[in-house]
Regions:
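Solvent-exposed, non-transmembrane regions of membrane-associated and secreted proteins
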Residues: 2-191
């Protein structure tokens, strides 16, 4: 009887612990989103990069909008595993915002880029960023020209290019499958 009570107490403690951790992670993600949006607004207002929190190793660099999908996310600098946990991010190997070339953004298939599974050629995409060279916000509009599933070794669509392009990449298939043997690539050209 006493063993049953101890076992019941342990199960209750374990359940409360798991529930508490889930609530903590959700609250942390919500707070991070608020801080990232606040840092983006500060960056646009001041013309200087603002980290979302003091120890952040990234900062917001753009806003990505896909109107048909009701998609509106802040893009972070540097597609590292830590940065990608908080939002879509710019690959360092791609073009810089506002410069000619292939601007490459990455995001997780289970969260930030999950809506891309519904994107189709012809969809408009808008990128907004603060151009520190001219001291003002700028916008570039794109149209999706291609959606393709490729092998991870096929990096031709991520390569630097003299052609202005926007490339969005995520793992494939979408969802929470343990494997992601392919990549889902969206290519868009400026209007």
């Amino acid at each position: 009887m006493k063993a049953l009570r101890v076992l019941s107490a342990l199960i209750l403690i374990a359940g409360a612990s798991l529930t508490g951790r889930a609530l903590y992670l959700h609250a942390k993600a919500e707070l991070a989103g608020v801080l990232i949006h606040r840092a983006w607004e500060q960056s646009v207002q001041t013309g200087k990069a603002h980290a979302p929190w003091p120890w952040a190793d990234t900062h917001p660099v753009a806003r990505l909008r896909i109107p048909r999908l009701d998609y509106d996310e802040i893009v972070l600098e540097g597609a590292t595993p830590r940065t990608l946990a908080f939002g879509p991010a710019r690959l360092f190997s791609g073009a810089n915002l506002g410069e000619p070339g292939n601007l490459v953004l990455a995001g997780h298939r289970t969260s930030w880029f999950l809506p891309l599974q519904a994107i189709v050629p012809g969809d408009p995409i808008r990128i907004e960023w603060f151009d520190s060279h001219i001291g003002q916000a700028r916008t570039r509009n794109y149209t999706v020209t291609m959606v393709r599933v490729v092998d991870p070794q096929d990096v031709t669509l991520l390569a630097p290019s003299p052609e202005d392009a926007l490339t969005l990449i995520t793992c494939y298939p979408f969802g929470h499958s343990p494997n992601s043997p392919q990549r889902y690539v969206v290519r868009a050209l400026p209007i």
